[in-house]
Each structure stands twice: as structure tokens, then as C-alpha cells.
Swiss-Prot record:
The keyword Translocase applies. Belongs to the complex I 23 kDa subunit family. GO terms for molecular function: 4 iron, 4 sulfur cluster binding; iron ion binding; NADH:ubiquinone reductase (non-electrogenic) activity; quinone binding. It comes from the Bacteria. [4Fe-4S] cluster 2 binds at C70, C99, C102, C105. This is NADH-quinone oxidoreductase subunit I.
Amino acid sequence: MINYLKSFFLYEIVRGMALTLKYFFKPKVTINYPYEKSPISPRFKGEHALRRYEHGEERCIACKLCEAICPAQAIVIEADEREDGSRRTTRYDIDMTKCIYCGLCQEACPVDAIVEGPNFEFASLTHTALIYDKERLLQNGDRWEQALASKLHKDYEYR
């Protein structure tokens, strides 16, 4: 009987309209994405990058810790030894379609060579465009070096 009276007096509709009026005059919580962007957390894990030292040499020492720790097996590294005895990578590939953006590669790196940058807009129409080689990763690092360095500096005490 109570349900009949509620439906007779349009209780559900009145309740729904009251809820609509309650939120009608509050500020919007959505953003117009391509034109407006929300702030990104300092610990955001986006597109990968390889960093260089200030004098231009790449930081990666080919220890392969990032390749070993990657749970998705998205990283492939090949390395050669130089005349001075140091090791450097000849091939450093990341398959971004396999990557789960966990950040373990960044945590495992002893020299902060591989980092996850601030970019989240790197969609592609082909699978091959999402397999990043060493040159692409170094270009990403060069492009975002200031942002990456400040991000690592802010996060240093928590590492």
C-alpha cells in the first residue's frame, strides 16, 4: 500500500528532481579534455624515457636490472663492452603495448637512466609505433630532462 501511495504522488520523480536541483548550482567537476587538462601527480607514470648525463653521454650502464625486473617482459636490452671496459647498450627496446606502467624498471635502475615521464598522450594507430627503440627513448629524455630531473629531486627522499 505504501509503494502504491508513493508512486501515486510521484515520490520517485520528486526525489530525483530534488537531487537534480541540489547539484544543478554546484560547480562542474568535469573538464573539456583536449582543451583543458587536470594537474598531474608528481609520481605519475607515463611515457618512458632514457636520460643522459650533463655532458651528453647516456646514463644506462647496461646492467639489465630493468629487463630482469619487468613483470610484463616488455624490455629487451643488448649490450657490448667498450674499449675502456664499460658496458653500454646497443639495443634498448620497450614494447609499450606490453608495459603495465608499474614503475619497477625505474626503481631498479641504479643510475636513474630509465624513467617514466609526464607524457600520457602517445596513442598510435599501429603496433610498431608503440615499440620504442633506444633513439626514441633518448629523444623523450632530452625533451623532458628538466621535468624529469625536478620530479626525481622531489621524490628523492621517498626512494
